[in-house]
Amino acid sequence: MADEQALRQGWTTGACATAAAKAACCALLGDGFPDPVGIDLPGGRTPAFALALAEMGEGWARAGIVKDAGDDPDVTHGATIIATLRHGIAGAGLVFRAGRGVGIVTRPGLPLAVGEPAINPVPRRLMAEAVAAIAARHGMACDLEIEISVPGGEDIALRTWNPRLGILGGISILGTTGVVIPYSCSAWIHSIQRGIDVARACGLIHVAGCVGSTSEKAVRKVRGLGEEAIIDMGDFAGGMLKYLRRHPIPRVTIAGGFAKMCKLAAGQMDLHSSRSQVDMVWLAAQLRSLGADAALVAASAQANTALEVLELAEGFPLGQAIARQARAAAREVLDNPEVSLDVLVVDRQGRVIGDAH
């Protein structure tokens, strides 16, 4: 990724839904489809979106926007966000519906009630403001129905956190600023927080934060946890632990591969390879404390990878030592006596090589 060239920002599903809803509302109330259609976002930005779909019939109008996530590897990039507007029941106000490809909330703990379409609060507000302004121009009450649909959203949702959060049937319509920042950590950390919120609301007493799929399989087998108890922590150990400090769950397991857990053991809370590295000299010192001879310690300090050190350390309980130190480092950040913390370290085959309580 070239440093000299800024990454291109994109637009959230919420921004696209707002633009589609505004265009459809204009058409429904007799103004025709604006193309492009401009919207007002929090923070003052006023993007305009080209319509990918514009159709209407008796009592309804429909508009679609193709989501452009910029240079972010967003799974919803290229999806068409469609809003269908209909006249509602007099006095009922604005009603949101989930069309095909948009999920329904089935578990408590999210900022939406169970049974509601997975259209988050900020996109709801932006859509409500946009259509209310159009209705007011026509001297009408805002008794309208907004249905959001996403063709293929059911399949896209399987590549998101939604099934684990209990959002079923499609994707969520998301966004707080309307803007997608490429490779931003905030979206992942937000998903971690929502996973913890749902676990707490469902009364779970044990969850596991996993670095990836290998550690997830291991922790589910060893700890006997169901899918609903798994938090996709990824590289954001610190983000998860800090949120758990304020929103505790009785028991938490952290599970990850040897290299990532070496970073955690050394006190690094961001485990991404571009933002933290395994300190080989520190790792060699752990081997020395386990009784390794000078030659092995020296070879370990010169190793290129943590995996190489693990192979050199055959016969020494290095995985267990790393698990203990990772638990101590995580415990310090967690800083909440209400939470029981343990750490699992796995090798590349998913075998547990360290388990510290």
UniProtKB/Swiss-Prot annotation:
Listed under GO biological process in this entry are: anaerobic cobalamin biosynthetic process; methylation
The catalytic activity of this protein is classed by the Enzyme Commission as 2.1.1.195
Q: Which reaction does it catalyse?
A: Co-precorrin-5B + S-adenosyl-L-methionine = Co-precorrin-6A + S-adenosyl-L-homocysteine
Q: Which GO terms describe its molecular function?
A: cobalt-precorrin-5B C1-methyltransferase activity
Quick check: keyword S-adenosyl-L-methionine in the entry? yes
InterPro entries annotated for this entry?
CbiD, CbiD_sf
Record flagged with keyword Membrane? no
Q: Which domain of life is it from?
A: Bacteria
The first-level EC class reads: transferase
Under Pfam families, the record lists: CbiD (PF01888)
For this UniProt record, give its keywords in alphabetical order, as a comma-separated list: Cobalamin biosynthesis, Methyltransferase, S-adenosyl-L-methionine, Transferase
Pathway involvement?
Answer: Cofactor biosynthesis; adenosylcobalamin biosynthesis; cob(II)yrinate a,c-diamide from sirohydrochlorin (anaerobic route): step 6/10
Q: Which family does the record assign?
A: Belongs to the CbiD family.
Entry protein name: Cobalt-precorrin-5B C(1)-methyltransferase
Please tell me the species this chain comes from: Paramagnetospirillum magneticum (strain ATCC 700264 / AMB-1) (Magnetospirillum magneticum)
Organism lineage reads as:
Bacteria, Pseudomonadati, Pseudomonadota, Alphaproteobacteria, Rhodospirillales
Q: Which gene encodes it?
A: cbiD
